[in-house]
């Protein structure tokens, strides 16, 4: 019988739903949920503690207080299950029904729901098209509203004040009706004809021309259509019945001393019931209108407070002056239902303790204290004890465990074997913050952690704590072992580099072991293999660092896994030969035959992983660690004060600098330099001195002179402990050593400006009081910053995760030919990242051809791994088009080919991988390392002088890209185009350097010329912008009248005169409309045409231009007609660090953005208005003229008659991503955001793969705006999900109809998260009330596609191992739609079984 009950219960699983819909509840629906009306405000009887009948905790309505027992105690026990007691009316059932049975309150007067009234934009107001202020006046009984105008001249929904109403009553009698309060609003809503409204509005949209009107109408139209489609009735926004929450969700707990702890909701409900009952009584008594009205208003206010306290007026407070927590407060915010209970739960079978080092552990192990293990694995131990017959009952087993009998420990050993546990360190910033280990039982009370995983956890042993969790089910154990085991997480998901990298002691040990020393004991010996080397070292015949010759055998594997053995004699040291014994077969000896620093060890592990695979690498990593620790101990490297050697040159250099500063001070006092110049010069002097002292000090520390075997002096690297620690990368850096032994240097104030007196002392000498005080100044700011940084970084991660959580790999291949074109990353002439590094792990979108031929190197859809990238490098391919997440055409999530390699595993990404969350974590996790500050240019920061020439750093040939140029008299090229670029290529055709060329740059080489390293190939004047002539001829001035449009200035020193054009604003009225121009004519005075065009060669001069020519003089091609002074642009603040990353992802518009050309065409200037310039572009494509107004103070980079391309920069400034998207397209904006974000991270030395940033950008581009609706149902100007539009368009095209046209939109991450399809996900992120209100009104349906929604409803997530389950369900759903539904089948079965059993019972 019991089994059958279980079976029937199991049939109605809650998981069997596919979507969640939210809507407005009708009064009937509320009554149908309810189990009875709550009539009294009483809660429980203070003497008996029994709930009062008909009160807020009534047992008759909500269910029994004790399991299977009615209130009066007449019926007890299971056998009366389902009986309703005739005395107290309580049903005999489980007490847990008190958690889900609801009640209701019949309101004596309708009440408006505050969410739909006050949550902006007010839904009620928008729907009725009445301002919110007016509606509130009606609701709170300040004015009347006309509900039925009848035959009068009044309008429907017109407001009347008390006096007006009385006047109209006298005038029209009962011809019309006007009411106040929620009833009036309810009547108005009830009498609205939705369909008619929709038709009116559609008509209005077609006829109106006003943009604001159109926007307003579209908004309202959307709302009305949503009401019609969702089947919501607008009058349901006014409540007539109020649901009452089940009592166990608003508990009342008696404390000792006769007091009660209660949920605030009970107070709020009591208020409502009291006022409602009073109102009913007043209505029965037919009390005067004014009293009833006041009571109705109070009822409205109390219901408002219950639903959302504090949204209107002052919040209702409890006895202790704090606002009561209303229903809305229960679900929103960090402590609300969503974030506290649904997205983050507490976990049983867990414990936490302090961590210590476990240097003897293997990589997959952790040390677990016995006491802890015993507690965590209790149930397993009980079952084992029972199973082996050592204990008869669970109770006996419990006793045995409590007594800690010897047998229990043996059993614990058994239980733990092969049962992984999860270790987690808070804050868990990326997925490596939780990993699985096999526990090893240890004495003591601290968890032991393997040192190599510290980097992933960001753990240290200064008191950090970690939590242990036990995976219970078999599936959980399987996942822990196969996916989360520390040995499976060797590579970082952010960059694909090893994250299991030795640091500190281990690095120092290996470094010490592989150093060489001149003339060490045993130098020049010949040794047979590492065994003999070890013997020589152990017996003291040879020192660790002695240079010797050793015979070694290398085993190398080629691509096909064929091994070749090679034995050879190599020059090496004893230490390196001994290290060779732990290196696995398959790696070359050369990889360890060098001094190993942190970088080299990282490469060693990376190489091992790529060539040997996971298993060997893990063993190797452990061996490296043990060896490193051992030799670090033997090295005896320690820091003493004498290790910090102060260079003698320091004192003389400091004295020289002080002398120089004194001179500048004197110059300043005699007025030769300004205060700003003096400050900058002083800071430059000290910065340079600091550098020199540091250099001297490092040279001093890093080398020492020793005698070699022949007794000659020789330089070798020093064995100074401090130097070794820094050089190996174990601890410290040159900058820190500089502070210890050089000079501390310049200090910054908290606002970022630099204090001009540096600290000349170092820590070895010690600081005096002044110096100490200056130090504390900046240091304190650093600490304050760190605290802020952590919070900001956490918030950025949260927003990123939220926006990207539903990007999961759904398909194998979406089949797109789109992609991004990758080129080497070049900055200021240096290759920052070569091409083969950037494309590693991507899939090729188009065949890669061998440069200069049609031979296909790599076919389309190849995943580029290390081997293929080498092919790319060898053939010096300079650009490759690769697939990208941004251009992926999958409707939901993305496809595997567009994503490419799973960085943490090194192979193609699997289906179901949640790449969005990984991307968010990879960008957010290093957030705490980024700086918080905005760099102010000043002092040391701006020392870089303005560049005025290009010197090439490599030998090769030069290549010009989209450059127009003319040849001047000297035979040099002069650039006449705006956005040209010059690159230097080596003999293999690889781009080595790249420079931007500005207009007017003079080149000494031509396209394709060979250059040598150090050649100066280009020069320009950084302070002015020239106007270059493209033809030769005679100068003729037009509209250049001295004193009106120009002034002549004579330089006092040289006596040369120059003409300066006046700004239009400064001219007299006569010169306002004149346009100073330089024209070129031939000898006969005829206009010269610009070659290849019909345009005369005339050059308009902007204000402030300087002309050095005389009227009638001759000029040659490529000469400068005029110069325009450039305001130096180096004084803007650079926003750096975290705030910059946040700005980029939020797609914020900068203050003064760059102005870009909206169309390709020819530029002209129109009439100027006050403060603005009118820019005209005659379009190439259709000859139309586009005009734009630009502020006068903006400096324009173009002249009249210039040709611009769409998206060209017209005025400099930071570019807005929105403009880039609109004018240059989706790939340009992706590249912009990627590069800008990478720049910030690169500064901090953090490596993140581009594809993570692209994944976020894809989510920012989720929405699009309809520009033309075609045959679709979309409205013009409507913002929709991109996927939905593409799906709809596909369908329209299939039916031969016209698809909708649209423009992609770029949304910031916060906006994008709130604009997701899923209202559950959006509500749990931010602005819960607004999201839910909107969703309810439009009757939204959540398809539960993302991860967050599924976590909230308590299912497996549709990613990772849960992906298969969801795929299966979707398949089943498709099958079910054909046959009868599964639920019907179960119901039929249940009915049959019921019929069979009930008779017997």
From Swiss-Prot:
Binding residues for Mg(2+): 460, 462, 464
Disulfide-bond pairs as recorded: none
GO cellular component terms, A-Z: DNA-directed RNA polymerase complex
UniProt keyword terms in alphabetical order: DNA-directed RNA polymerase, Magnesium, Metal-binding, Nucleotidyltransferase, Transcription, Transferase, Zinc
Residue positions binding Zn(2+) 2: 814, 888, 895, 898
UniProt keyword Oxidoreductase, yes or no: no
GO terms classed as biological process: DNA-templated transcription
Cofactor(s) in the UniProt record: Mg(2+); Zn(2+)
Record: residues binding Zn(2+) 1: 70, 72, 85, 88
SMART domains named among the record's database cross-references: RPOLA_N
Catalysed reaction, written as an equation: RNA(n) + a ribonucleoside 5'-triphosphate = RNA(n+1) + diphosphate
Pfam families membership: RNA_pol_Rpb1_1, RNA_pol_Rpb1_2, RNA_pol_Rpb1_3, RNA_pol_Rpb1_4, RNA_pol_Rpb1_5
Subunit and partners: The RNAP catalytic core consists of 2 alpha, 1 beta, 1 beta' and 1 omega subunit. When a sigma factor is associated with the core the holoenzyme is formed, which can initiate transcription.
Family named by the database record: Belongs to the RNA polymerase beta' chain family.
Protein's name according to its UniProt entry: DNA-directed RNA polymerase subunit beta'
Gene name of the encoded protein: rpoC
């Amino acid at each position: 019988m019991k089994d059958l009950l279980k079976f029937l219960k199991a049939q109605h699983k809650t998981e069997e739903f596919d979507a969640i819909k939210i809507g407005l509840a009708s009064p009937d629906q509320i009554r149908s949920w309810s189990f009875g009306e709550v009539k009294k405000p009483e809660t429980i009887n203070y003497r008996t503690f029994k709930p009062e009948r008909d009160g807020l905790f009534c047992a008759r309505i909500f269910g029994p207080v004790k399991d299977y027992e009615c209130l009066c105690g007449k019926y007890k026990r299971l056998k009366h299950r389902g009986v309703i007691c005739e005395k107290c009316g309580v049903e005999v059932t489980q007490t847990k029904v008190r958690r889900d049975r609801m009640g209701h309150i019949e309101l004596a007067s309708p009440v408006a729901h505050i969410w739909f009234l006050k949550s902006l934009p007010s839904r009620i107001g928008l729907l009725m098209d009445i301002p919110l202020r007016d509606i509130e006046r009606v609701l709170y009984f300040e004015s009347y509203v006309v509900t039925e105008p009848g035959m009068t001249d009044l309008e429907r929904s017109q407001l009347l004040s008390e006096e007006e109403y009385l006047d109209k009553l006298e005038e029209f009698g009962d011809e019309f009706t006007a009411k106040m309060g929620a009833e009036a609003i309810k009547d108005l809503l009830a009498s609205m004809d939705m369909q008619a409204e929709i038709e009116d509005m559609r008509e209005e949209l077609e006829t109106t021309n006003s943009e604001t009107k159109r926007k307003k109408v579209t908004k309202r139209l959307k709302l009305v259509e949503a009401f019609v489609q969702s089947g919501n009735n607008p009058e349901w926004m006014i409540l007539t019945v109020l649901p009452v929450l089940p009592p166990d969700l608003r508990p009342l707990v008696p404390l000792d001393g006769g007091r009660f702890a209660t949920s605030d909701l009970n107070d709020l409900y009591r208020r409502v019931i009291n006022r409602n009952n009073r109102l009913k009584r007043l209505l029965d008594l037919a009390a005067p209108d004014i009293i009833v009205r006041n009571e109705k208003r109070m009822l409205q206010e109390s219901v408002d407070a219950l639903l959302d306290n504090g949204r209107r007026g002052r919040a209702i407070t409890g006895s202790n002056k704090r606002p009561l927590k209303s229903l809305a407060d229960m679900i929103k915010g960090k402590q609300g239902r969503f974030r506290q209970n649904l997205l983050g739960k507490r976990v049983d079978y867990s414990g936490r303790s302090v961590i210590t080092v476990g240097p003897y552990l293997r990589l997959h192990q952790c040390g677990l204290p016995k006491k802890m293990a015993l507690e965590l694995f209790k149930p397993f131990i009980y079952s084992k004890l029972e199973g082996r017959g050592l204990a008869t009952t669970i109770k006996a087993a419990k006793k045995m465990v409590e007594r800690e009998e010897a047998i229990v420990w043996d059993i614990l050993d058994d239980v733990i074997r092969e049962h992984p546990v999860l270790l987690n360190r808070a804050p868990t910033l990326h997925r490596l913050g939780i990993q699985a280990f096999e526990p090893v039982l240890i004495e003591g009370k601290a968890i032991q952690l393997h040192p190599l995983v510290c980097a992933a956890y960001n753990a240290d042993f200064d008191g950090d704590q970690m939590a242990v969790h036990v995976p219970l089910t078999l599936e959980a154990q399987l996942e822990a072992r196969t996916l989360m085991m520390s040995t499976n997480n060797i590579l970082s998901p952010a960059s694909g580099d090893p994250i299991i990298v030795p640091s500190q002691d281990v690095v120092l040990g290996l470094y010490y072991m592989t150093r060489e020393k001149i003339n060490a004991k045993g130098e020049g010996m010949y040794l047979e293999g590492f065994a003999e080397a070890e013997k020589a070292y152990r017996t003291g015949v040879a020192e660790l660092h002695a240079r010797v010759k050793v015979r070694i055998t290398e085993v190398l594997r080629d691509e096909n896994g064929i091994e070749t053995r090679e034995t050879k004699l190599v020059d090496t040291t004893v230490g390196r030969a001994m290290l060779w014994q732990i290196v696995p077969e398959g790696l070359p000896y050369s990889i360890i035959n060098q001094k190993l620093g942190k970088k080299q060890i990282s490469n060693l592990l990376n190489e091992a992983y790529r060539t040997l695979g996971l298993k060997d690498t893990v063993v190797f990593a452990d061996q490296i660690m043990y060896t490193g620790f051992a030799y670090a101990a033997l090295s005896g490297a320690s820091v003493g004060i004498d290790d910090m050697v102060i260079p003698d040159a320091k004192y003389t250099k400091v004295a020289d600098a002080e002398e120089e500063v004194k001179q500048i001070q004197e110059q300043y006092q005699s007025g030769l330099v300004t205060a700003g110049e003096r400050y900058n010069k002083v800071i430059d002097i000290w910065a340079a001195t600091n550098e020199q002292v540091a250099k001297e000090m490092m040279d001093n520390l890093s080398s020492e002179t020793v005698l070699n075997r022949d007794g000659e002096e020789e330089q070798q690297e020093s064995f100074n402990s401090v130097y070794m620690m820094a050089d190996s990368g174990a601890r410290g850096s040159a900058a820190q050593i500089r502070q210890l032994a050089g000079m501390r240097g310049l200090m910054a104030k908290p606002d970022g400006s630099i204090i001009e007196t540096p600290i000349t002392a170092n820590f070895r000498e010690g600081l005096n009081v002044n110096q100490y005080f200056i130090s504390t100044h900046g240091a304190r700011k650093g600490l304050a910053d760190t605290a802020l940084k952590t919070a900001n970084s956490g918030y950025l991660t949260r927003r990123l995760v939220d926006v990207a959580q539903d990007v999961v790999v759904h398909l194998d291949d979406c089949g797109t030919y789109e992609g991004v074109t990758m080129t080497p990353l070049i900055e200021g002439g240096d290759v920052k990242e070569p091409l083969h590094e950037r494309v590693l792990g991507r899939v090729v979108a188009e065949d890669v051809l061998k440069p200069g031929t049609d031979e296909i190197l790599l076919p389309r859809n190849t995943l580029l791994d290390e081997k293929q990238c080498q092919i790319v490098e060898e053939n010096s391919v300079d650009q490759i088009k690769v697939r990208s997440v941004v251009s992926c055409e999958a409707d939901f999530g993305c496809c595997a080919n567009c994503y490419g390699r799973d960085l943490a595993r090194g192979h193609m990404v699997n289906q179901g991988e949640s790449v969005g969350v990984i991307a968010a974590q990879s960008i957010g996790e290093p957030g705490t390392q980024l700086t918080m500050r905005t760099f102010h240019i000043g002092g040391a920061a701006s020392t870089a002088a303005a560049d005025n020439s290009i010197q090439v750093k490599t030998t090769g040939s030069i290549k010009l890209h989209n450059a127009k140029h003319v040849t001047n008299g000297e035979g040099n090229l002069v650039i006449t185009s705006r956005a040209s670029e010059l690159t230097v290529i080596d003999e293999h055709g690889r781009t080595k350097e790249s420079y931007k060329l500005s207009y007017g740059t003079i080149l000494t080489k031509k396209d394709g010329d060979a250059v040598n390293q150090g050649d100066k190939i280009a020069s320009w004047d950084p302070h002015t912008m020239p106007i270059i002539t493209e033809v030769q001829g005679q100068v003729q001035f037009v509209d250049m009248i001295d004193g009106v449009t120009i002034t002549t200035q004579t330089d006092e020193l040289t006596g040369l005169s120059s003409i300066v054009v006046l700004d239009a604003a400064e001219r007299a009225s006569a010169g306002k409309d004149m346009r100073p121009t330089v024209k070129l004519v031939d000898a006969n005075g005829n206009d010269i045409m610009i070659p290849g065009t019909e345009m005369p060669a005339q050059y308009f001069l902007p204000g402030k231009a300087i002309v050095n020519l005389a009227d009638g003089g001759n000029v040659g091609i490529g000469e400068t007609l005029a110069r325009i002074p450039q305001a130096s642009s180096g004084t803007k603040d650079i926003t750096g660090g975290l705030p910059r990353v946040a700005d980029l992802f939020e797609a914020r518009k900068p203050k003064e953005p760059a102005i870009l050309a909206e169309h390709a065409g020819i530029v002209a200037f129109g009439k100027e208005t006050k403060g603005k310039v009118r820019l005209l572009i005659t379009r190439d494509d259709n000859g139309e003229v586009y005009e734009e107004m630009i502020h006068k103070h903006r400096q324009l980079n173009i002249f009249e008659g210039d040709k611009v391309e769409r998206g060209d920069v017209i005025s400099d400034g930071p570019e807005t991503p929105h403009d880039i998207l609109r004018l240059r397209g989706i790939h340009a904006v992706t590249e912009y955001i990627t590069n800008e974000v990478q720049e910030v991270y690169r500064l901090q030395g953090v490596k993140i793969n581009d594809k993570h940033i692209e994944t976020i950008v894809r989510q920012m581009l989720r929405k699009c705006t309809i520009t033309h609706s075609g045959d679709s149902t979309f409205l013009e100007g409507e913002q929709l999900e991109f996927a939905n539009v593409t799906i709809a368009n596909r369908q329209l095209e299939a039916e031969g109809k016209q698809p909708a046209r649209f423009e992609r939109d770029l949304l910031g991450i916060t906006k994008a998260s709130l604009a997701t399809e899923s209202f559950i996900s959006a509500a749990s992120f931010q602005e819960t009330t607004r999201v839910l209100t909107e969703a309810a009104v439009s009757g939204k349906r959540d398809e539960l596609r993302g991860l967050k929604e599924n976590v909230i409803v308590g299912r497996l997530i549709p990613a990772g191992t849960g992906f298969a389950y969801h795929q299966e369900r979707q398949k089943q759903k498709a099958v079910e739609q054909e046959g009868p539904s599964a639920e019907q089948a179960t119901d039929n079965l249940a009915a049959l079984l019921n019929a069979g059993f009930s008779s017997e019972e």
